[in-house]
Amino acid sequence: MHADFWQQRWRAGQIGFHQAQVNQDLQQYWPRLGLAPEARVLVPLCGKSQDMSWLIGQGCHVVGAELSETAVESYFSEHGVQPQITRQGDFSVYAAPGIEIWCGDFFALTSQDIGHCTAFYDRAALIALPADLRERYVQQLEALMPRECNGLLITLDYDQSRLEGPPFSVPPTWLQAFVSGNWNITKVGEHDALHSSPKALKAGVERLDEQVYVLARKLR
């Protein structure tokens, strides 16, 4: 998926991946991370997710990363917030109480840019990327996050041969192969998401599972 693909999707309003409501898995499983008050939380490929406002409401400081300026501006306008906008290198940084969104290439971010984030939340980043970029994404996430951190990861698992992504299928075997080396992976939830996806039903997909994981970085 090239940057132009996602830019065009946002400009055209083709954002079926966007959830208008706060994700239920986030609300149910986020407390398992046991974060300190005012923890900085990285939300990669954040779009204009309502989940960010929920995290702010939990006392977190959200650090979003998003390629599309349209998505970032929509987030703040829909919440009636006027952000302070500054330029930091190749990024435009939109900041308001409890949140900052770095608008630009996620893969160009550094840990110095985003500060000390002790947790991350990924509902729609990993599954948005094809296999080759997923490996690069995991490496970038590890470069951005500190030695002691954890996160909540939500994935989809389905027969990829029946449906062309995004969203892509990220089965447990992929996580075991490419994530488990540096992270302890605990599955905390799973449910059938097939009937909430008209695209999958139309394609004849017979099984679509949403899976929820808590990831904790292994101490070396």
UniProtKB/Swiss-Prot annotation:
Q: Provide the GO MF annotations for this entry.
A: thiopurine S-methyltransferase activity
Question: Gene3D superfamilies recorded for this chain?
Answer: Vaccinia Virus protein VP39 (3.40.50.150)
Q: Which UniProt keywords apply?
A: Cytoplasm, Methyltransferase, S-adenosyl-L-methionine, Transferase
* Key word Transferase present: yes
Q: Which Pfam families match?
A: TPMT (PF05724)
Q: What class of enzyme is it?
A: transferase
EC number(s)?
2.1.1.67
GO terms under cellular component:
cytoplasm
Localization annotation: Cytoplasm
- Record's keyword annotation contains Transferase: yes
Q: Name one GO biological process term.
A: response to metal ion
Its main subcellular localisation, reduced to a broad class, is cytoplasm
Which HAMAP family does this entry report, sorted A to Z? Answer: Thiopur_methtran
The record, for PANTHER family, names:
THIOPURINE S-METHYLTRANSFERASE
**The family this protein is said to belong to:** Belongs to the class I-like SAM-binding methyltransferase superfamily. TPMT family.
The name on file for this protein is Thiopurine S-methyltransferase
Organism of origin is Pseudomonas syringae pv. tomato (strain ATCC BAA-871 / DC3000)
Organism phylogeny: Bacteria, Pseudomonadati, Pseudomonadota, Gammaproteobacteria, Pseudomonadales
- As recorded in Swiss-Prot or TrEMBL, the protein's gene is named tpm
